[in-house]
């Protein structure tokens, strides 16, 4: 952990300036934290915690931490605030995170199976219901005799989307201990749960069209009167690939 002051992005620092959940670190600060570009960092100002994606390592050590204006505005993090920064993002157990508005991590894994991974990176209040859906699927598969693992994050607090909805945790190394554990092997199938502000449910991903179509047909046969399901990538804004 390092203690630093928050600075604005410099002029022309497009990788950080207009992005949410974005920051950059000086070479010295990055070295002390042992982080690289695309890693995540946890920032605490004494009242709250939030997560940022390190978009780049900038040049001057005089400015150890630069945080985008969108991130500061959305989370109430002040320019020139004194903060502590660390590499490990999850802060507390699930129940304590829920009580205090923090972030927790869940991993259920036998350290060896490579058949199925269930993945919910924005659970809790961040994308409400996604971790619950992931856990239900995990238990259903386990009870049906399938080997599977689960990794999920649970962010809490009414402002959890602004504080914890950071993109691409899968590109990080050492930021989420549970994710590091399940990332040490290749799976036959990975199922990821997300929420979108659209009027349909998209079955996306890199798996072939016939598989996605089969999933949509099965879901449609069960609850066709309540939801619209789509499987063609061209019909979805977020394709998940």
Predicted regions and their residues:
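Autoprocessing Asn-cyclization modules and mimics
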Residues: 1-32
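Small-residue-enriched segments and motifs
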Residues: 4, 49-53
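Short, surface-exposed loop/turn motifs at beta-strand boundaries within globular domains
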Residues: 16-18, 34-36, 111-113
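Serine-hydrolase catalytic machinery in alpha/beta-hydrolase-like enzymes
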Residues: 27-33, 44-46, 147
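N-terminal catalytic or cofactor-binding beta/alpha core of small enzyme domains
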Residues: 27-28, 53-60, 64-241
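Short conserved beta-strand and strand-loop elements enriched in small hydrophobics
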Residues: 36-48, 81-87
């Amino acid at each position: 952990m390092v203690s630093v002051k928050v600075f604005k992005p410099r002029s022309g620092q497009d990788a950080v300036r207009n992005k949410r959940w974005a920051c950059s670190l000086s070479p010295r600060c990055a070295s002390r934290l042992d982080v690289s570009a695309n890693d995540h960092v946890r920032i605490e100002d004494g009242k709250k915690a939030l997560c940022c994606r390190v978009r780049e390592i900038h040049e001057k050590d005089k400015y150890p931490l630069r945080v985008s204006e969108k991130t500061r505005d959305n989370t109430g993090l002040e320019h020139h605030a004194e903060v502590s920064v660390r590499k490990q993002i999850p802060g507390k157990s699930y129940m304590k995170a829920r009580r205090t508005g923090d972030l927790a991590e869940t991993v259920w894994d036998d350290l060896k199976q490579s058949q199925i991974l269930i993945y919910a990176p924005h659970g809790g209040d961040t994308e409400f219901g996604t971790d619950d859906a992931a856990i239900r699927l995990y238990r259903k598969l386990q009870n049906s005799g399938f080997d599977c693992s689960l990794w999920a994050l649970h962010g809490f607090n009414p402002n959890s989307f602004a504080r914890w909805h950071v993109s691409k945790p899968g590109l990080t190394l050492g930021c989420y201990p549970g994710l590091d554990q399940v990332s040490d092997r290749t799976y036959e199938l990975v199922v990821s749960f997300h929420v979108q502000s659209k009027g349909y449910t998209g079955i996306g991903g890199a798996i072939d069209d016939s598989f996605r179509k089969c999933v949509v047909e099965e879901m449609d046969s069960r609850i066709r009167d309540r939801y619209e399901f789509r499987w063609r990538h061209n019909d979805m804004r977020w394709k998940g690939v």
